[in-house]
Regions:
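Juxta-kinase regulatory segment immediately upstream of eukaryotic protein kinase catalytic domains
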Residues: 1-52, 239-245
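Active-site beta-strand termini and strand-to-loop segments that position acidic
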Residues: 65-69, 117-118, 170-172
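Conserved structural core of kinase catalytic domains
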Residues: 95, 102-142
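Protein kinase catalytic-loop region centered on the HRD/HxD motif
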Residues: 146-159
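Hydrophobic residue at the +6 position relative to the catalytic HRD Asp in the kinase catalytic loop
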Residues: 164-170
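C-lobe/activation-segment region of protein kinase-like
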Residues: 171-247
Length: 247
């Protein structure tokens, strides 16, 4: 059973000021977490940091599980060596994605921390390797395509879906969730759907697993996406699902 500790527990110092301890950074993170209503942290996850644990680690932040009241949340915490001065822009993009029906629910954000829904599940490739039922795979693919189209139509580019292994989680109910809006932008050209189609159906490590459940013609898919690039329209989802026989 995972251990739950108060924010001030000494074991969390290595997490709240990772990778290099700075008392100023630690106190700033601690203050932001308190302002978000976080009182406890769950020592759970696959990554060890001293005597604590994380569920994720990136170039600018680390992620652990916290508690706001009786709700478990994912806490994204700015690293002490981060090149980004604040996580607030990422939180703003996540909030926008939420308005499109995409991403883990945002609960709050400060300069050094984001509190959001904790998505329990596996990344898309690992989930496929677990040999789910074909119908579940088909539903997940439709879900992913639909979410990417929604982001395109509403003007937010995720920025990292051409290499989406770490950015698409399939939860315990088989529903897809796109995560990590650190590189997202509302000003550049939207490429979510074209990026994820390239990742799913043209990247060999993913497509060989999908091919056990779905059939497609690469030339036809390429032509469909060329048409979409020339004239972005929601109609593309019907065309894609028809070709992939996902209806």
């Amino acid at each position: 059973m995972a251990v739950v500790v108060p924010l001030e527990d000494r074991r969390l110092k290595a997490v709240l000021s990772y990778p290099h301890f700075s008392n100023a950074h630690y106190e700033a993170v601690l203050g932001d977490l308190r302002a978000l209503g976080v009182e406890w942290v769950v020592l759970a996850g696959g990554l060890e940091v001293g005597d604590a644990r994380l569920i994720g680690k990136g170039c600018t932040s680390v992620v652990c599980i916290g508690m706001i009241g009786d709700r478990q949340v994912a806490l994204k915490i700015r690293r002490s060596d981060s090149s980004r001065e604040s996580l607030e822009a990422e939180a703003s993009n996540l909030e926008f994605a939420n308005s499109c029906g995409v991403g883990p629910r945002l609960f709050g954000a400060r300069k050094n921390a984001i509190a959001m829904e904790h998505i329990r599940g596996q990344n898309f490739v690992r989930w496929l390797e677990g040999k789910p039922h074909t119908e579940a795979v088909r539903r997940a693919v439709v879900d992913i395509l639909g979410q990417c189209l929604s982001l395109d139509m509403n003007g937010l580019d995720h920025g990292e879906l051409s290499e989406a292994k770490k950015h698409i989680i399939i939860n315990e109910d088989g529903k897809a969730c796109i995560i990590d809006f650190e590189s997202a932008s509302r000003s550049r050209k939207r490429r979510n759907l074209t990026s994820v189609v390239s990742y799913l159906f043209f990247k060999e490590s993913v497509s060989r697993l999908l091919a056990m459940h779905i059939n497609w013609d690469k030339k036809v898919l390429t032509d469909i996406m060329k048409g979409y690039k020339a004239d972005p329209s929601e109609r593309v989802l019907v065309t894609l699902t028809s070709h992939l026989k996902l209806y």
